[in-house]
Amino acid sequence: DKIISGYRNIIARAQAKGIKIIGATLTPFEEAVYYSEEGEVQRQAVNRFIRNSGEFDGVIDFDAVVRDPSNPKHILPAYTEDNLHPNNAGYKAMAEAIDLNLFR
């Protein structure tokens, strides 16, 4: 997959220079005009890579924070106004999910 290959390239180059790389998962986007099932499959694959590869120095799971548990391809209604972008409450939840120790 080109996205994961791109991540691996960036990770290797950055870490070779002593730069920490923090991965952040991709949030749901089913209501976007460009949504496709293939895109969702890719999003899930990228998120699995970010969460489980061990290649990042840390991970922030924005997907887990904002997704609707009853419909995981959607952002929780309380966290969005357009079903695609987080609103202030969504961004607040995302910010609160960041472990600042990742940056030390």
Predicted regions, residues:
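Oxyanion-hole/transition-state-stabilizing segment in secreted/luminal serine hydrolases
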Residues: D1-K2, P28
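Well-ordered, non-membrane alpha-helical segments in soluble/globular domains
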Residues: I3-Y7, R43-Q44
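Surface-exposed amphipathic alpha-helices with a cationic face
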Residues: Y7-Q15
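A short helix->loop->beta-strand "cap" motif at the edges of active sites that frequently abuts
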Residues: K17-K20
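Catalytic His-Asp segment of secreted/periplasmic serine-dependent ester chemistry enzymes
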Residues: T27-R104
